[in-house]
């Protein structure tokens, strides 16, 4: 699948997400978790990744590897923060740097 088709498919999926707190899990073509993030509004945050526009080098590289994503709705931002932290520790995703070493504290 070409890059533009892949991004269009992912953006369409992202635009169907709810506007609630949650955690999103980016995966590559092998289904391996490459990034875990949290958001106050899942739809807004996840769709930003797949829209045209400026991205820093790390984000652009990560997006180029994303083939699919999952998400988990949370009741509160604090629940999302805790879940994000636990998932990063479980999967140690390539593009999550801040929480990998378990030395820094999670924040909203």
Identify the meaning behind each predicted range.
Residues 1-108:
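Acidic, glycine-enriched active-site microenvironments
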């Amino acid at each position: 699948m070409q890059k533009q088709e892949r991004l269009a498919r992912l953006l369409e999926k992202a635009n169907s997400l709810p506007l609630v707190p949650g955690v999103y899990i980016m995966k590559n073509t092998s289904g391996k978790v490459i990034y875990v993030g949290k958001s106050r509004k899942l739809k807004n945050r996840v769709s930003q990744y797949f829209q045209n526009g400026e991205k820093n080098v790390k984000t652009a590289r990560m997006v180029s590897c994303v083939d699919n994503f999952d998400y988990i709705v949370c009741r509160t931002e604090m629940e999302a923060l805790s879940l994000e932290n636990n998932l990063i520790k479980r999967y140690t995703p390539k593009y999550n740097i801040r929480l990998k070493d378990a030395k820094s504290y999670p924040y909203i």
